[in-house]
């Protein structure tokens, strides 16, 4: 497979030092061991067993890894010893763990400086060497890997390459002769398999980094030495402040949880590792469902309590059945209390991408969202279990301190490697367990598939009553809370810093909000009106507001474009205070020596500027009357900022309907204290995590109300526009009617006084008429701008709703398409199975008829044999009977040969060359086959 470079273009070189550099990605030695185990587990090898052991060869301590998988050819071995070649694919639902084509190189070179690989695949045998020592001795500038290939007759293939590679291997490896290499190939059990030997292990203080002495059936990481306190247990870097689980320093414990559903036996130093079905070995097991927005399908999460050690808890995160992160603490487990102690969560994150060493995930947005969701789900499980157990056993120990047993007992068959569920109470199991030992007769045969799991990926397996109770309590408490909050919100004084009003140029610009948001805030506060309360004394520069104007001017926090995800910015510097005078303040009963000042305020709403003029309003009294006048002036300055002369639009107080329409159509900005109080309300609301759904539903309802109200305003705007057009038309008609035209091409004159008298019924001055006409034009322009603003809000609202509905429809379409695909696949498989069953039925009927025929022939032969035996006694027919017996024996032998060939089609393991047709062996085999066929047909 050595690629030749294009002419004139150089290949990228790989320095031998990269072997060590590449291995440094494994900061923990067991992650390097896991890479070699993964290579045996992957579907292209599909090993049933792997043996890991420590041995000594030529005074070198070595680690050996031997599996009984499919083995490799010399070309495939070359790819394995090269970098980045990974052609692993899923086979029969078995998903490969390997992704990058780098696991063997990084793992083996992390454990030791030199590695040799022996492999055979039934047709050929190969030996390959990956050695840093060899490359240093020959001073190689590129990584070279000697490979020797043998055929099944132990003869070398490709003599030119193999001789040079053989010489290099014999000189720089632990095996000095060809016979020793072949002996290692013979050490591989069976016709296929692979054996890896690693030596020159990484050492620390003249000793290897592994402890082989403390447990003769385990490989452990030595305990850390502390000169002051003495020995202390080994801890991974990320667990320096936690209790380290045994899997951190024991290879046997780590291998037992390495795979979510183990399909391969691991024999460590001669003793089988008792692998765990992690998701089944917990207590109080419940399942929850995670629905990420970035994924079209749901993800199952399993929660339970650790039965062995409550101090080992957290999330077990798997990827393609392989453990990536163990005991990752999330949610309430991160707090400095006993919440979440003992709870273990299990999730298979196939939608995340693992890092280079398969010990962590890439820190992406998807990973962060997943960790957050896991924390919320774990909090729900913890609260539910806490409430449930305290309710059932109020005087008992805390749930984390109760002695627990796994909810179920599962064991793996040593023959077929299938997992079987056992009845409760079966703790003592033999060293080797087979399906035939199963008490359940339904799963007593290795041919029977495993017990199917619950495939419900839509609903959790438990009801979150604690969450619902909190939600109901908050719903009951909310009506009592909102009036109190609104009262504080409307009458709470806010101190303003005086430097911000030193110059008109330093005034903070007003905030522009969408009309839909402001109308929602106005309605929300109007729904919870409270009677006015006495305002406490304060040095605030703001004037008192009437209850109605305060409610109208209050502003809710900013909402996102979809009205779902709310964001509040507390430290906002671009807020100012604007008081909009819509109603005349009644004249106080007692006259005060206070200057009265008319106010004019500007409201900018989405690019539309609207002006209002209110009547004079007296400043409210505070505790000190001496400073009331100055306080009033400052309050006016704070409210109106700068007095800008502008066109005055006079409001007709007599037309109440028009005033109400204007008050509702124009959305008013809010005060600073209103926004601050809304933020406090939101913080109070956010204490309950479940309130998000209710708030979302409320926002959707408010959105519908906004849309309806907007349509109403639009209709009213159109109505007023039509009325104004009618008035304009009447004015034009009056002009045409009462205009005197001169025939001498002089200017046309209009009797304005007569025109006004005709329209209004009374005499009006021309100046007043012009002002009213200008006012009408301004009113038309304002209504047009309001109309355009409302149309803009409607477009935004419709776009938000369309986006929501579109995303939901897309998600439903994807799920429905997946269901239809699965249904089609199931129907195709069902048809295939039907056809196979029909063929088997036909074959069975044919075999049954043939067996019946053979039975009758055998009975006939037996009867003829008995008759001939009785006739032998007569001396007169001795020669004839002998000849007859010879002929019958020949017939019987030929019949047995035919029966044997037929049985070979039914029983493939039957070796006809070892069958003696002169005895009744074939008859016994035929009888057994007939009995089995009858049992099968009866079942």
Swiss-Prot record:
Effect of residue 794 to R: Loss of sumoylation
Ways its activity is controlled: Dimerization of the ATPase domain is strictly required for the catalytic activity and binding to double-stranded DNA. Disrupting the interface between ATPase and the CW domains releases autoinhibition since the CW domain sterically impedes binding of the ATPase domain to DNA.
Residues binding Zn(2+), per UniProt: 413, 416, 435, 446
Swiss-Prot/TrEMBL keywords: Chromosome, Coiled coil, Host-virus interaction, Immunity, Innate immunity, Isopeptide bond, Metal-binding, Nucleus, Phosphoprotein, RNA-binding, Ubl conjugation, Zinc, Zinc-finger
Main localization, broad class: nucleus
Biased composition (Polar residues): 524-539, 631-640
Chain positions of all zinc fingers (CW-type): 404-454
Locations listed in the record: Nucleus, Nucleoplasm; Nucleus matrix; Nucleus, PML body; Chromosome
Placement of covalent cross-link Glycyl lysine isopeptide (Lys-Gly) (interchain with G-Cter in SUMO2): 191, 205, 231, 280, 293, 555, 597, 650-651, 740, 794, 855
Modified residues (Phosphoserine): 503, 514, 540, 560, 765
Cross-link (Glycyl lysine isopeptide (Lys-Gly) (interchain with G-Cter in SUMO1)): 597, 650-651, 740, 794
Protein name (Swiss-Prot/TrEMBL): MORC family CW-type zinc finger protein 3
Species of origin: Homo sapiens
């Amino acid at each position: 497979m050595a690629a030749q470079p294009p002419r004139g273009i150089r290949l990228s070189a790989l320095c031998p030092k990269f072997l060590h550099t590449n291995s440094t990605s494994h900061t923990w030695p067991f992650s390097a061991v896991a890479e070699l185990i993964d290579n045996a587990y992957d579907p292209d090898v599909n090993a049933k067993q792997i043996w890991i052991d420590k041995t000594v060869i030529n005074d070198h301590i070595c680690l050996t890894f031997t599996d009984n998988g499919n083995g490799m050819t010399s070309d495939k071995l070359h790819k394995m010893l090269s970098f980045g070649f990974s052609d692993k694919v899923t086979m029969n639902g078995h998903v490969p763990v390997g992704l990058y084509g780098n696991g063997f190189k990084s793992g083996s070179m992390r454990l030791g400086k030199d590695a040799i690989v022996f492999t055979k695949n039934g047709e050929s045998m190969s030996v390959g060497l990956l050695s840093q020592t060899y490359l240093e001795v020959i001073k190689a500038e590129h990584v070279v890997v000697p490979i020797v290939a043998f055929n099944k007759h132990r003869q070398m293939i490709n003599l030119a390459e193999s001789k040079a590679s053989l010489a290099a291997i014999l000189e720089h490896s632990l095996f000095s002769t060809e016979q020793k290499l072949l002996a290692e190939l013979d050490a591989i059990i069976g016709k296929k398999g692979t054996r890896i030997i690693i030596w020159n292990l990484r050492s620390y203080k003249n000793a290897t980094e592994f402890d082989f002495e403390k447990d003769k059936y385990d490989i452990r990481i030595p305990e850390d030495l502390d000169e002051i306190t003495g020995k202390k247990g080994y801890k991974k870097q990320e667990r320096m402040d936690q209790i380290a689980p045994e899997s951190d320093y024991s290879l046997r414990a780590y291998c037992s949880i390495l795979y979510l559903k183990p399909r391969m036996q691991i024999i460590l130093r001669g003793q089988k590792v008792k692998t765990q079905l992690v998701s089944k070995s917990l207590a109080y097991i419940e399942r929850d469902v995670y629905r990420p927005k970035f994924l079209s399908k749901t993800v199952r999460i399993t929660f339970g309590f650790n039965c062995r050690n409550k101090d080992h808890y957290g999330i077990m995160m798997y990827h393609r059945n392989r453990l990536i992160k163990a005991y990752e603490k999330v949610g309430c487990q991160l707090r400095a209390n006993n919440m979440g102690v003992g709870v273990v969560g299990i999730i298979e994150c196939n939608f995340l991408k693992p890092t280079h060493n398969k010990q962590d995930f890439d820190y992406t947005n998807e990973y962060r969202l997943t960790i957050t969701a896991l924390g919320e789900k774990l909090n729900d499980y913890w609260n539910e279990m806490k409430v449930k157990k305290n309710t059932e056993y109020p005087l008992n120990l805390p749930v984390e301190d109760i002695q627990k047993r796994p909810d179920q007992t599962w064991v793996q068959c040593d023959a077929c490697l299938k997992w079987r569920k056992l009845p409760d109470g079966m703790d003592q199991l033999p060293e080797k367990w087979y399906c035939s030992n199963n008490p359940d007769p339904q799963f007593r045969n290795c041919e029977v598939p495993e017990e199917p799991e619950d495939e419900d990926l839509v609903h959790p397996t438990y009801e979150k009553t604690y969450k619902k109770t909190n939600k109901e309590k908050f719903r009951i408490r909310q009506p009592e809370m909102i009036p109190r909050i609104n009262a504080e919100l409307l009458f709470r004084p806010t101190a303003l810093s005086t430097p911000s009003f030193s110059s008109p140029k330093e005034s903070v610009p007003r905030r522009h909000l969408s009309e839909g948001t402001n109308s929602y805030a106005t309605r929300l506060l109007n729904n919870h009106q409270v009677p006015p309360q006495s305002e406490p004394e304060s040095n605030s520069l703001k004037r008192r507001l009437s209850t109605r104007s305060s409610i109208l001017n209050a502003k809710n926090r900013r909402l996102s474009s979809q009205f779902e995800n709310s964001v509040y910015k507390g430290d906002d510097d671009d807020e100012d205070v604007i008081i909009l005078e819509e109603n005349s303040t009644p004249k106080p009963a007692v006259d005060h020596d206070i200057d009265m000042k008319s106010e004019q305020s500007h409201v900018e709403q989405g690019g539309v500027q609207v002006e209002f003029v209110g009547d004079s309003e007296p400043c409210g009294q505070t505790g000190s009357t001496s400073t009331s006048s100055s306080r009033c002036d400052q309050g006016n300055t704070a409210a109106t900022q700068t007095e800008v002369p502008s066109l005055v639009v006079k409001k007709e107080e007599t037309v109440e309907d028009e005033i109400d329409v204007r008050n509702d159509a124009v959305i008013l900005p809010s005060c600073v204290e209103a926004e601050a109080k809304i933020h406090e309300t939101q913080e109070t609301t956010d204490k309950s995590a479940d309130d998000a759904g209710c708030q979302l539903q409320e926002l959707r309802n408010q959105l519908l109300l906004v849309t309806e109200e907007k349509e109403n305003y639009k209709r009213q705007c159109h109505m007023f526009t039509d009325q104004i057009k009618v008035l304009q038309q009447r004015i034009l008609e009056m002009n045409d009617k009462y205009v005197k035209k001169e025939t001498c091409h002089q200017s046309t004159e209009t009797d304005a006084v007569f025109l006004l008298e005709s329209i209004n019924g009374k005499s009006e001055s021309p100046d007043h008429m012009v002002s009213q006409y200008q006012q009408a034009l301004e009113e038309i322009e304002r209504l047009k701008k309001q109309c355009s603003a409302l149309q803009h809000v409607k477009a935004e609202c419709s776009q938000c709703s369309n986006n929501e509905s579109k995303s939901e429809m897309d998600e439903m379409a994807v799920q429905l398409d997946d269901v239809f695909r699965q249904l089609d696949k199931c129907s195709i498989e069902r048809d295939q199975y039907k056809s196979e069953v029909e063929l088997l039925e036909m074959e069975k009927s044919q075999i049954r008829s043939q067996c019946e025929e053979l039975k009758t022939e055998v009975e006939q032969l037996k009867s003829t044999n008995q008759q001939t035996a009785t006739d032998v006694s007569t001396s007169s027919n001795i020669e004839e009977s002998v000849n007859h017996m010879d002929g019958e024996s020949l017939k019987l032998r030929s019949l047995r040969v035919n029966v044997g060939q037929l049985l070979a089609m039914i029983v493939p393991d039957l070796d006809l060359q070892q069958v003696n047709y002169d005895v009744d062996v074939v008859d016994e085999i035929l009888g057994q086959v007939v009995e089995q066929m009858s049992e099968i047909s009866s079942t």
